[in-house]
Structure formats: C-alpha cells, structure tokens
Design a protein with these regions (language model features):
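Anionic, Ser/Thr-rich low-complexity intrinsically disordered regions
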Residues: 2-97, 101-121, 126-145
Length: 145
C-alpha cells in the first residue's frame, strides 16, 4: 500500500464522498440516514481520510471537548482494507493532531467489536456508554497522550 495517503478532504466533492463513506460503513447498516452523521461538533472538527488510488478507504474525526481533551469519532476502515494497519495509522494521525493542538487526553466511545483494537493502542476502558443514538453497545475509553 505504497500509495496510501492520509489527508483532510480537499474540497466539497471530497467532503461529500467522505460523508457517504462514513454513512455507508457506520450508519447505513443500522438504518440511520446520512443526515444522522452531523452533530454539534461537525463544523469544528478535524476530519481525516485515508485514500488509495483516489478512493477513500478509511476515515476518522477528532474534535476538542475542552482545551486539553479531544474526542475521536467516526473511525472506520473499508472491510477490504482491514487488518493491514490502516486503522492503527489513522488512529496515530488523529492522536498526533490532538497532541499538536495541546490535548493531553483523548476519549472515544468504541463499539464492542473494536475494544480489542483500542486496547492494543493503549486505550483504557472507563465505562459502558449509553448515550449513543445507534442502539449499538459502546464503551467509553481514554488515553493520555
């Protein structure tokens, strides 16, 4: 995967493709509309995509909760590209952006099937999270950076 590039979506067309990718992987399978992607942090978030051959294959979003704490949301890797290190690289890039902007801690709400992935990246379990609008069990995890 020598041609993998992580970047912020470069224009409106690519942002629309990014939204469609996020929705297709994370929200459509549970019956949510594409509009359900947008929350109060959307416009002030750091959005990152992983691109191979001009195709989005991974995504993640980071926003700041306060001056020292950031939250990662909407992390996903296309099934065809999973278990090749893209998720780990995406996570590292989001963490790096948080650290570069003075975050000391990152939190996230992991779907249960992703807990092992985040634990391997040194995230610690805090508690079960019950605030998700997805109906899917999540666990709040944290990491000092």
């Amino acid at each position: 995967m020598n041609n993998l590039e992580f970047r912020v979506p470069k224009d409106e067309k690519e942002f629309n493709e990014y939204d469609l990718f996020r929705w297709r992987l994370l929200r459509k399978p549970i019956g949510k509309t594409i509009e359900s992607l947008k929350d109060e942090y959307e416009d002030n978030s750091f959005h990152l995509i992983g691109v191979i051959d001009n195709q989005i294959v991974a995504c993640g979003r980071l926003h700041f909760i306060d001056d020292s704490k950031a939250q990662i949301r909407y992390m996903a890797v296309d099934e065809e590209y999973q278990r090749r290190g893209l998720g780990t690289s995406m996570l590292a890039a989001l963490e790096s952006h948080a650290k570069d902007n003075n975050a000391e801690k990152i939190i996230l709400n992991a779907r249960d099937h992703a807990i092992k992935f985040y634990t391997a990246a040194k995230y610690k379990i805090l508690e079960k999270y019950h605030g998700s609008d997805t109906g899917i069990p999540h666990t709040t995890m944290t990491k000092d950076i």
